[in-house]
């Protein structure tokens, strides 16, 4: 009996030591660690007012909300990584200078950012697929891709869509100026609504579409049909 108790104590000690080693500096990053790393990366590098860090946060939150409303289960690792990194190719050195399509360039580049963070690389292909189809004119397939796509599309409509485009206007008369910003909003109003595919996303299209329509109507009335912008 004493021998058995001694063996049990030794085994417990070995388990405690193993746990201590696992939490040491040589351990692989935990799930929370890779998410914190990715979030901090986006916060430091994605500074554009229209498609920077705050846009990533909105896309992630809205995609989760839409999926929950539709009772669709998502792989949150895939959604989180794709939402926070989907516009990476809009920023140098990962893209920046008018790449062929930032969705494709970003999908190819994202592995370099995730590698070494502790992200489960077996899910990298799904992240790439979601990034590749996040724009409203693309056709998403997997649930994570669908809800990121719809969240990103809806972020071009409503008051937030106005805020994003307005933030791009050059105050010194450069590109884009006020009239061009209006054309961008009109393009979004014309092209984006029909591309939202999920039931919960479709339910938000009408209110956001109407809000953007009202804004453009009132802005036109107050600016001689946009000539005095």
Annotated model-derived regions:
Residues 59, 101-115:
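An active-site-proximal "capping" alpha-helix that borders the catalytic cofactor pocket
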Residues 2-14:
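Bacterial N-terminal signal peptides that target proteins for export
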Residues 12-22:
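Bacterial N-terminal signal peptides
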Residues 24-32:
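Boundary at the C-terminal end of the N-terminal hydrophobic targeting segment
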Residues 53, 57-60, 76-80, 121-132, ...:
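Short, well-structured alpha-helical segments
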Residues 33, 45-57, 61-73, 85, ...:
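Divalent metal-dependent phosphate-bond-processing catalytic cores, especially two-metal-ion Mg2+/Mn2+ enzymes
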Residues 76-98, 102, 106, 126-137:
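His-Asp-centered metal-binding catalytic motifs of divalent-metal-dependent phosphohydrolases/nucleases
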